[in-house]
């Protein structure tokens, strides 16, 4: 299958890409950083997911995994608006089989930073919208909403023992 994943240079996105490659799928990554994966089944585009006008032309995506995300002043633009732009460009078409949006437990709990929670809550609502729209293609759209994940993005909360304990308690 042709799998498109955003945010593939590290953390969750890189792990997902490697698993699909190990299973023999064709994987295409989009990230602001250079490729962190070297594999014959992997193609990588360096671009900012927020820049809808300069997204690469990729036809017939079968699986889309929206993983690119952040926890800073760009939460709404990257976590929500860019995810919508990517999905509208690549998933709303007859070849799609599955869309997976990497959300956050914060979409359900409201904990952590206000803009981050709002962005991930928006992802949850948009996931439901897309699920209804692509069902006619026989496709599904789901959101995976993990709690605290040990990635560089979460360093600001991991390094705060009190905040990290709160997150672990809620998730």
Per-segment meaning from a language model:
Residues 98-122, 127-136, 148-149:
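Catalytic loop of short-chain dehydrogenase/reductase
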Residues 40-51:
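Rossmann-fold cofactor-recognition segment
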Residues 67-72:
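Conserved NAD(P)H cofactor-binding loop of Rossmann-fold oxidoreductase domains
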Residues 145-156, 165:
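Short, flexible catalytic-loop segment of classical short-chain dehydrogenase/reductase
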Residues 23-37:
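Conserved glycine-rich Rossmann-like NAD(P)H-binding loop of the short-chain dehydrogenase/reductase
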Residues 9, 17:
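N-terminal Rossmann NAD(P)H-binding glycine-rich loop of SDR-like oxidoreductase domains
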Residues 161-171:
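Catalytic Tyr-x(3-8)-Lys segment
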């Amino acid at each position: 299958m042709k799998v498109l994943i955003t945010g593939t240079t590290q953390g969750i996105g890189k792990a997902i890409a490697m698993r699909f490659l190990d299973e023999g799928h064709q994987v295409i990554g989009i990230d602001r950083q250079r490729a962190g994966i070297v594999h014959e089944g992997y193609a990588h585009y360096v671009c900012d997911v927020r820049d809808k006008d300069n997204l690469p032309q990729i036809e017939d995506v079968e699986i889309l995994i929206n993983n690119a995300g952040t926890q800073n002043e760009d939460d709404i633009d990257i976590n929500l608006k860019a995810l919508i732009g990517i999905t509208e460009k690549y998933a709303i078409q007859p070849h799609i089989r599955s869309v997976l949006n990497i959300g956050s437990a914060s979409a359900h709990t409201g904990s952590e930073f206000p803009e981050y929670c709002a962005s991930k809550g928006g992802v949850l609502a948009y996931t439901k919208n897309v699920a209804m729209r692509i069902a006619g293609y026989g496709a599904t759209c789901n959101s995976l909403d993990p709690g605290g994940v040990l990635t560089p993005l979460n360093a600001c909360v991991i390094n705060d023992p009190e905040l990290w304990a709160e997150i672990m308690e809620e998730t």
